[in-house]
Amino acid sequence: MVHALHETHRVLKPNGLLLDLRPGAVHRRVGIEVDGQYRQLAMMNESLEDDYAANQAVAEVIQKGVFKLVSRIQVNCNRVMALKDFPNWLSDFPNDRAAQQERLIRIVEHAFKEAKGNRKRVVVKGPLVLKVLRKDQV
């Protein structure tokens, strides 16, 4: 990752900006919303190793003066979907935790079945972090 950041630095024009937009390195919360009321059901247990490595790489190039941190903002991001779309969305995560994913699907399906209301949807909550980095002349 550090190599990729150095390559980005190489191709950016002087004082160019790099926008680093990634999910925050926290486990996402999974719940359902019924008629506008949210209820958390579970916390995902996805691997955060890649997130930690990316954060470390960005911190390293900032510390070395390759880039300067201009600003950082964290915003809540709610991924909203129909129940039928949840298993497909979940399949985007590494499949080394297939049993946990199946259990999570069953929990959400059961909550949907038991919930009383007209408008039901799955909501996955987690932060997005945007860092704006400026190319420094090394």
What annotation goes with each model-predicted range?
Residues 1, 26-27, 79:
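Alpha-helix N-cap/loop-to-helix initiation residues
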Residues 2-17:
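A short glycine-rich, Lys/Arg-flanked "PGG" loop and its adjoining helix->strand segment in the class I
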Residues 8, 37-40, 88-92:
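Short, low-complexity, polar/charged sequence segments that are solvent-exposed and flexible
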Residues 12, 42-47, 93-99:
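Glycine-rich loops and low-complexity Gly/Arg-rich segments
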Residues 17-49:
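Conserved class I S-adenosyl-L-methionine
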Residues 48-66:
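Short alpha-helix
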Residues 65-138:
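Conserved Class I S-adenosyl-L-methionine
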